[in-house]
From Swiss-Prot:
InterPro entries hit by this protein: 4_helix_cytokine-like_core, Interferon_alpha/beta/delta
Species of the source: Bos taurus
Cysteine pairings via disulfide bonds: 52-161
GO process annotations (BP): adaptive immune response; B cell activation involved in immune response; defense response to virus; humoral immune response; natural killer cell activation involved in immune response; positive regulation of biosynthetic process; response to exogenous dsRNA; T cell activation involved in immune response
GO CC annotations on file: extracellular space
Primary site of residence: secreted
Keyword terms: Antiviral defense, Cytokine, Disulfide bond, Glycoprotein, Secreted, Signal
Domain of life from the UniProt record: Eukaryota
UniProt keyword annotation of Transcription present: no
Subcellular localization(s) per the UniProt record: Secreted
Protein's UniProt name: Interferon beta-2
Underlying gene: IFNB2
Pfam families listed in its UniProt record: Interferon (PF00143)
GO molecular function, one term: type I interferon receptor binding
Amino acid sequence: MTHRCLLQMVLLLCFSTTALSRSYSLLRFQQRRSLALCQKLLRQLPSTPQHCLEARMDFQMPEEMKQAQQFQKEDAILVIYEMLQQIFNILTRDFSSTGWSETIIEDLLEELYEQMNHLEPIQKEIMQKQNSTMGDTTVLHLRKYYFNLVQYLKSKEYNRCAWTVVRVQILRNFSFLTRLTGYLRE
């Protein structure tokens, strides 16, 4: 009797997880709410000192990101997940020179982590089903973009101005993410 109840509970959990992972409307709602909170948290960090304007670099976001409407929802999931993961990784680096609030950064990291957890079951499912997609190509271009951001931070020894430049890039990324999230329709 106990084994049968346990089996039913396991099956129910598996089914509900799959059903939730397929609910793109719910996912879109969660992502939009979370992205808005991330942007709000980033904007709470101290703004750009005037002398940092000289440190600006033109980091080119991959071209395909500028035409987000061309993404299928599966590709959008792969790209969103990659961007969140890369932003998370950048924000775990040494930002001590910035004067940024550790609490705000921790809240931001927690929010990013939650978003990735919502996306991960769908992302894994897509990765298992598809061999090559537009999302895969875009992910490779994104990795190069984020690699360049990290290299920039390293070359500037994680100074305040470098972080200010990267913060602006991350804010732009959240605009792209918000647009991509709009394509997560049923």
